[in-house]
Amino acid sequence: MKKTALLNAELSYLVASLGHFDEITICDAGLPIPNETQRIDLALTHGVPAFIDTVRVILSEMQITGVLLASEFKQVSPDLHRALIELVEQEKLAGSRIELIYISHEAFKERTSNSKAVVRTGECTPYANVIFQSGVVF
């Protein structure tokens, strides 16, 4: 059995297979997922698993170099947005250089088709979606 926080086999494989600048999306329960993109559906019920818990576990194993968010997230769901930014800031304090980019929600939905996978959570907070660009550890 794995010893680290990320126990889900599909997610663990996804993170291990990422190359530099590959993207993954972590989304709320309502974001449309392109048919051609791998879907890792974790949603059990409203709020389970939570978006921020899923992000926290993925960041425990994934090196990131970029973060893409819908600009609407900041205004509509400021508390969850702030919690996400705090996690990104912790990654920066650990020495990571991370670019934060805001785009429209429509552009965000289109951009998800570039992701290697979309991870669907049970989150029901509006605009609780993020695209992470993979970094390297060297």
Curated annotation (Swiss-Prot):
Origin species: Psychromonas ingrahamii (strain DSM 17664 / CCUG 51855 / 37)
InterPro entries: D-ribose_pyranase, RbsD-like_sf, RbsD_FucU
Protein name: D-ribose pyranase
Pathway linked to the protein: Carbohydrate metabolism; D-ribose degradation; D-ribose 5-phosphate from beta-D-ribopyranose: step 1/2
Subcellular location: Cytoplasm
Active site: residue positions: 20
Pfam families referenced in this protein's UniProt entry, alphabetically: RbsD_FucU
Broad EC category: isomerase
Quaternary structure and interacting proteins, as annotated: Homodecamer.
Entries under Gene3D superfamilies matching the protein: RbsD-like domain
